Amino acid sequence: MEFLRIENLCKFYGKGENQVTALDHVSLTVTKGEFIAIVGASGSGKSTLLHAIAGVDVPSSGNIYLNGQDVYGQNREHLAIFRRRQIGMVYQFHNLIPTLNVVENITLPVLMDRRKVNQQRLNELLALLGLEERKYHLPNQLSGGQQQ
């Protein structure tokens, strides 16, 4: 079953002689359950591609479909909702709020989306991540891996 389809994706930054091509007609299909790695030299477009897939950086042209849904075929409001509810990214450099504990950092996006926190799911996530004993710790009290 097709999970991700990218068709002729292009991304340009700047204009004229200062224009930089970050993505040049990238096409890719990933089936559900398939594991892929995106590798390349620094500046080769890896982060730009991932940001485009996640709906964070709008491509110059081309299409991205996640679970059959056209990521950029929706208005900005629906794209923001889609991003919050359907996409997850783990950055190399995390952006945790230093004054919030583990539980507060995990639940903040749900609360900002005006939804109720599912306590059972929260406890499952904490167990899966091995953070049950550290759920009230601040980010600076966690290892780098735990922060991710």
Language-model segment annotations:
Residues 2-148:
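ABC family nucleotide-binding domain
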